[in-house]
């Protein structure tokens, strides 16, 4: 199995500087230490095997046994790529983000992995599922593969002026020099070039005019890509915005 692992302690704070001095103010995100997780127990449809799957969400510690759509709990601003889909009445899940022990606390393990589904044990569909966490919400249940961005509400309101983002991380990338394309609707193909991992932060100023038109202007950007595995954890990595 081709797999890319990205172990991430969290995005627990933004480092900011105020005034003319260099005093650093650390502003944490709620649940950003990743020590609390919600476990969801989902029962998939019998037509695809009827398995019971676990999905994990960042938020106040709780276990939910239900196929109900999930919404953020306890004021958690976090969402991830663990989702429940319901297409033509068939319930299917994907789990590519997991809580994992790190020292006295927890971290998030994000995997890029193959997810397969068999219908009546005959039709085998395999797709690549990439693990990710982000600030915002997912509109469950997922009802199709068209326009995936419409299923996300990316970003949260942030009124401070951050100068940098800081987090701990650990990476393990696949050794292959090629990537695999597998959408489930066409044959699996190989694409030249190594895979990479990205952390992306966009700051936008948004406003609305009296006619109800919403505008946005980007005022800050941070993009960091990782193309090599790390030798253990990198602590307090700080990237300017």
Stretches with model-predicted labels:
Residues 20-162, 166, 192-206, 210-241:
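Aromatic (Trp/Tyr/Phe) and Gly/Pro-enriched flexible surface segments
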Residues 177-181, 212-213:
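A short secondary-structure junction signal
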Residues 13, 163, 171:
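Functionally constrained cores in energy, signaling, and assembly domains
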Residues 14-16, 78, 173, 177:
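Residue-level detector of intrinsically disordered, flexible termini
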Residues 182-187:
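Intrinsically disordered, low-complexity domain-flanking/linker segments in eukaryotic proteins
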Residues 1-26:
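Bacterial Sec-dependent N-terminal signal peptides
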Residues 171-178, 189-194, 207-208:
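Extended, low-complexity, turn-rich repeat/linker tracts enriched in Gly/Pro/Ser/Thr and Asp/Glu
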């Amino acid at each position: 199995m081709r797999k890319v692992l990205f172990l991430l302690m969290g995005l627990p704070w933004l480092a900011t500087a105020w005034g003319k001095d260099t005093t650093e103010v650390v502003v944490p995100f709620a649940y950003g230490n990743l020590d609390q997780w919600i476990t969801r127990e989902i029962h998939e449809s019998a037509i695809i095997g009827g398995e019971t799957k676990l999905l994990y969400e960042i938020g106040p510690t709780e276990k939910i046994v239900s196929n109900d759509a999930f919404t953020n709990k306890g004021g958690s601003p976090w969402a991830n790529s663990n989702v429940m889909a319901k297409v033509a009445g068939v319930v299917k899940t994907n789990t590519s983000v997991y809580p994992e022990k790190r020292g006295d606390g927890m971290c998030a393990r994000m995997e890029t992995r193959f997810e397969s589904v068999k219908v009546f044990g005959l039709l085998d569909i395999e797709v690549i599922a990439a693990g990710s966490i982000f600030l915002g919400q997912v509109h469950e249940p997922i009802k199709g593969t068209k326009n995936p961005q419409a299923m996300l509400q990316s970003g949260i309101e942030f009124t401070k002026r951050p100068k940098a983002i800081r987090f701990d991380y650990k990476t393990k990338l696949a050794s292959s020099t090629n990537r695999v394309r597998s959408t489930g609707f066409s044959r699996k193909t190989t694409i030249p070039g190594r895979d990479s991992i990205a952390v992306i932060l966009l700051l936008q100023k948004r406003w609305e005019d009296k006619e109800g038109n919403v505008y946005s202007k980007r005022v800050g950007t941070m993009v960091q890509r990782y193309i090599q595995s790390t030798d253990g954890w990198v602590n307090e990595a700080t990237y300017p915005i």
